[in-house]
C-alpha cells in the first residue's frame, strides 16, 4: 500500500458547527472593501465588470499600480468568471493609498480609486518572514515558531471534512501544508481547477488548459480565510505527484499559466506560504531546471515575497539557491541540522517526519511518544518540524470510512497536545528561537548566558552536573514532555550545578536566567562537557 493510496478521503465525520463554512457561491469570498478602508496586511479587492466573450483568462490582461507617496506596487489581476475581474492588494503600511488600472480591455483600463489603510486588528501580525538567520517572525516583529501539521486535501475536500480539520487544528497548530491542485479523494466526481473536455487520460489530454474553473479557487480561498481567522499559516503546495488528471505532466506554458493565475488570486492573503512541490523528485515529467524556473516565476509574480521552499522524497533540493527562503525536508535525521545550516544558511523545517498512526507501512505507524520525541529532537537541534497523522478508518459505526487527518479529517492521535505543550514552552522561553549548542554532551539548545534547555532523549541519568555560566543565577524547571508537566526546582543555580533527575527517559530541564551575579562570580566556572 502506497502513501497516496492510504491518504484517501472517505465519508466525513460530524461537522464542527462553529466552523461550518457558508455554501459556496460565485461571489467573492473577500469581505467587502467598498467602504474604502482596509487594515494593514488585510486584503483590499477591486471588482470590475468586463468582457465575458472569447477566453478572458488568456485574452485580457489586467493589473493595477497601488501608490503611496513615492512608492508604487504593481499587482496583477485575474478573471473570476461571469464577466467579473478582480485585483487583490495587501497593503503593508498605513495611511492613504491610490490605484490606477492598466488593461488590454478598454472598459477595465484607467480605472482609479483611493482608500485608507488603518492599523491592524488584534491578532493580525502580518505575513511571516525569516528572521535571526535560522528562525521566523511576523512582519510586525512578533515571534513565529512553526509548529505545523499536514492536511493535504483541505483546499478541495468537502465542507464537512474541512470543518473537522479546522476544529482539530485550531489552538494546536499554527501552520498546515495543503495541496492547491487536487488529488483523488475516492468519493466520486470532484470539482477540478480546469474544465474538462470529456474524461481525462493519464496525460491530461482532455483537460482544457486554456481556462480555469473559478469555483474551485473560490472554495480554496474560503479555506484560506478560515485558516487565517484561526491564526494558521497555509503552506500552499503548488505541484505534487498524486493527481489522476495529468496535472503533474502539463506543458511548460500551462505550468506558468497556472502559477501566474494562482499567485494573482492568492498572494494577497497574508497567511500564504509557497511550497513549489511535495515530493518534487517523484514528478517525473519535470527536470531540475523546471523546478528552478518555477521558483523564479513565483518569486517574480508575488509582489509580497511570501516564504518559498520545496519538499522532496529522496533527492534533497539545493536550498542554498537564492529564491529559496528556507528548507522544507522529508527526513528525521535531525543530527545533520548543523551541517545543513552551514551549507544553506537558512531556517530548516522538517516538514515530514513520518506519521503518527497504525497503517502497514513504516512511515505511517509512529506512536504518539515517538512523534513527540521527534519534535523535541528537531527543536533541540535548532530547527522545526511538522506533524502528520494517518489511522485506519473503521468499517462501521459513526466514523466509518472517515478521512485520515493528513487528508483533512478528524484528529485522532495523542501527540498534538504534547506538540502544543512544546510550542508553549518555546514561546515562553525565547523571542528569537532556540539555537543548538554545539559540542554539548547531552542535547541542548538555547541562548548563551540567558537560556539553556537540555533534552536527554532515551537516556535516563539519575543526576547530572550542568555547566552553567558562573556569572548569573538561573532558575531550573524539570520538564516531562509526554506527561506535559513542569516542576520548578527550589533555589537558583550558578556555575557547575549537580542536580538530581527523574531517572526516566525522554526528560528535559530548562534553565532561565533570573539575575546577574554582582561582584566576584560564585560557583565553579563551567568547563567543556567531557565526551565518553
Regions found by a protein language model. Give the residues of each.
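Aromatic- and carboxylate-lined catalytic core of secreted/periplasmic carbohydrate-active enzymes
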Residues: 357-358, 371-488, 503-532
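Surface-exposed beta-strand/loop patches in extracellular or lumenal glycoproteins
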Residues: 43-56, 459-470
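Catalytic-core region of carbohydrate-active enzymes that cleave or remodel glycosidic bonds
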Residues: 321-395
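Extended acidic/polar, glycine-enriched regions
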Residues: 75-131
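Active-site mouth of glycoside hydrolases
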Residues: 122-336
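Exposed aromatic-hydrophobic patches
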Residues: 86-89, 496-502
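N-terminal export signals
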Residues: 5-24
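C-terminal segment of N-terminal export signals and the immediately downstream linker at the start
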Residues: 20-36
Amino acid at each position: 500500500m502506497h502513501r497516496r493510496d492510504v491518504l484517501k478521503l472517505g465519508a466525513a465525520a460530524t461537522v464542527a458547527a462553529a466552523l461550518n463554512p457558508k455554501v459556496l457561491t460565485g461571489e467573492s469570498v473577500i469581505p467587502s472593501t467598498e467602504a474604502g478602508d482596509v487594515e494593514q496586511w488585510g486584503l483590499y479587492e477591486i471588482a470590475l465588470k468586463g468582457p465575458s466573450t472569447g477566453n478572458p483568462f488568456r485574452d485580457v490582461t489586467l493589473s493595477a499600480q497601488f501608490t503611496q507617496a513615492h512608492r508604487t506596487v504593481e499587482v496583477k489581476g485575474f478573471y473570476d468568471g461571469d464577466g467579473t475581474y478582480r485585483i487583490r492588494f495587501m497593503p503593508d503600511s498605513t495611511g492613504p493609498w491610490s490605484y490606477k488600472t492598466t488593461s488590454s480591455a478598454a472598459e477595465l483600463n484607467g480605472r482609479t480609486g483611493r482608500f485608507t489603510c488603518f492599523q491592524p486588528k488584534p491578532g493580525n501580525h502580518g505575513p511571516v518572514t525569516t528572521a535571526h538567520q535560522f528562525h521566523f517572525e511576523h512582519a510586525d516583529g512578533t515571534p513565529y515558531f512553526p509548529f505545523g501539521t499536514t492536511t493535504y486535501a483541505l483546499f478541495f475536500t468537502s465542507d464537512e471534512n474541512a470543518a473537522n480539520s479546522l476544529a482539530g487544528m485550531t489552538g494546536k497548530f499554527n501552520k498546515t501544508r495543503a495541496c492547491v491542485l487536487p488529488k483523488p479523494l475516492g468519493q466520486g466526481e470532484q470539482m477540478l481547477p480546469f474544465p474538462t473536455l470529456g474524461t481525462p487520460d493519464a496525460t491530461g489530454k482532455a483537460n482544457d488548459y486554456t481556462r480555469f474553473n473559478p469555483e474551485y479557487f473560490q472554495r480554496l480561498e474560503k479555506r484560506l480565510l478560515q485558516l487565517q481567522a484561526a491564526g494558521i499559516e497555509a503552506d500552499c503546495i503548488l505541484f505534487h505527484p498524486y493527481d489522476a488528471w495529468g496535472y503533474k505532466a502539463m506543458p511548460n506554458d500551462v505550468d506558468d499559466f497556472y502559477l501566474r493565475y494562482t499567485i494573482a488570486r492568492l498572494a494577497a492573503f497574508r497567511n500564504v506560504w509557497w511550497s513549489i512541490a511535495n515530493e518534487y523528485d517523484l514528478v517525473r515529467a519535470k527536470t531540475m531546471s523546471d523546478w528552478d524556473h518555477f521558483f523564479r516565476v513565483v518569486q517574480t509574480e508575488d509582489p509580497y515575497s511570501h516564504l518559498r521552499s520545496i519538499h522532496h522524497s529522496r533527492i534533497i533540493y539545493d536550498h542554498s539557491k537564492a529564491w529559496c527562503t528556507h528548507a522544507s525536508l522529508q527526513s528525521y535525521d535531525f543530527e545533520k541540522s548543523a551541517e545543513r545550516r552551514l551549507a544553506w544558511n537558512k531556517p530548516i523545517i522538517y516538514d515530514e517526519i513520518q506519521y503518527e498512526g497504525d497503517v502497514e507501512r513504516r512511515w505511517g505507524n509512529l506512536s504518539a511518544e515517538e512523534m513527540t520525541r521527534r519534535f523535541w529532537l528537531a527543536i533541540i537541534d535548532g530547527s522545526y518540524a511538522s506533524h502528520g497523522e494517518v489511522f485506519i478508518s473503521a468499517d462501521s459505526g459513526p466514523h466509518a470510512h472517515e478521512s485520515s487527518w493528513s487528508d483533512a479529517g478528524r484528529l485522532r492521535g495523542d501527540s498534538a497536545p504534547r506538540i502544543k505543550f512544546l510550542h508553549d514552552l518555546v514561546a515562553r522561553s525565547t523571542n528569537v528561537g532556540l539555537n543548538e549548542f554545539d559540542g554539548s554532551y547531552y542535547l541542548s539548545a538555547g541562548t548563551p548566558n540567558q537560556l539553556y534547555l537540555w533534552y536527554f532523549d532515551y537516556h535516563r541519568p539519575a543526576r547530572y552536573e550542568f555547566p552553567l555560566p558562573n556569572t548569573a543565577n538561573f532558575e531550573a524547571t524539570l520538564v516531562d514532555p509526554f506527561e506535559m508537566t513542569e516542576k520548578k526546582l527550589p533555589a537558583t543555580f550558578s556555575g557547575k550545578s549537580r542536580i538530581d533527575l527523574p531517572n526516566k527517559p525522554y526528560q528535559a530541564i530548562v534553565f532561565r536566567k533570573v539575575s546577574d551575579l554582582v561582584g566576584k562570580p560564585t560557583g565553579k566556572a563551567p568547563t567543556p562537557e567531557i565526551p565518553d
